[in-house]
Amino acid sequence: MAEAGKHTTVLLQEAVEALALKPDGIYVDGTFGRGGHSRLILERLGKNGRLIAFDRDPVACAVGRSFGDERFCMVHSSYSRLQEVLRQLNIGQIDGVLLDLGVSSPQLEEATRGFSFSMEGPLDMRMDTTEGQTAAQWLASASEVQLEEVIKEYGEERFAKQIARAIVKARARQPLVTTSQLAAIVAAAIPARAREPKQNPATRTFQAIRIYLNQELERLSLALPQCVEMLKTGGRLVVISFHSLEDRIVKRFIREGANTDKLPKHLPLRADEVRRFSRASLQMVGKAVRPGVAEVECNPRARSAVMRVAERINTT
């Protein structure tokens, strides 16, 4: 089993191998976390290789800055600013980018971060604790309609209406400031007979609030086109997602990028327009990869992981 408080990197070998590393290449780890993927990438890069890592979490950035490797640059920022940051660093194009989405084990297991429904802590849930509103602040001000929409859309929770109503009633009695308060409210709002086996009833609601507050899906949608724009021909995009909302975005993006049937019908086009519409920007590399039985047994959080890989083509 994974050690509590320690982040066990999911699909570590598979993800780094999927990057098809060149010793002198330039790579981006868009979600540094606790540096599992970055460490292995650096081990395999040559002396002239470079790795730029992004993370919104100040604690993660502190870990990265302790590396002491001149080939490595730690950036306190969302990967959704990838293109802007790389240009600031005078980097033209890159050989590969890795995105390991979601929340890390240390974030979940640090009670003060407020991500976990199983630990008593303040309702925070921010990836970047230096900016933005906390979960407690949002829960205090959101309308019942907004609560329902967020829980339904980002948590895919069929009892979103009942949960939203329960939150509004509860906050009228006292402020909602702790994870245990919210978890209890959600649990009480879901009929016992409708609860999913082996899943805490608060799972989907906590996921929804976290995704909404941190704009996780919006940032992913912003980042993917930037990744492709910055990749050299033959460069790899590797994305590990942990729930269907993320994976849907990644799968659709890669599929659309690989689609060569983009010519508008019955329209006269110039030669440059024909090239622009007919050329794919990506090709899929293999099938989706999931953790094996042994990895899931050692790290149950790996169970829902899905890795998709694409390669940049036709950059001219």
From Swiss-Prot:
Its EC number is 2.1.1.199. Keywords: Cytoplasm, Methyltransferase, rRNA processing, S-adenosyl-L-methionine, Transferase. Coiled coil: none annotated. It is found in: Cytoplasm. GO terms for cellular component: cytoplasm. It comes from the Bacteria. It holds the Pfam family Methyltransf_5. GO terms for biological process: rRNA base methylation. GO terms for molecular function: rRNA (cytosine-N4-)-methyltransferase activity. InterPro entries: RsmH (IPR002903), SAM-dep_MeTrfase_MraW_recog (IPR023397), SAM-dependent_MTases_sf (IPR029063). NCBIfam families: 16S rRNA (cytosine(1402)-N(4))-methyltransferase RsmH. HAMAP family: 16SrRNA_methyltr_H. This is Ribosomal RNA small subunit methyltransferase H.
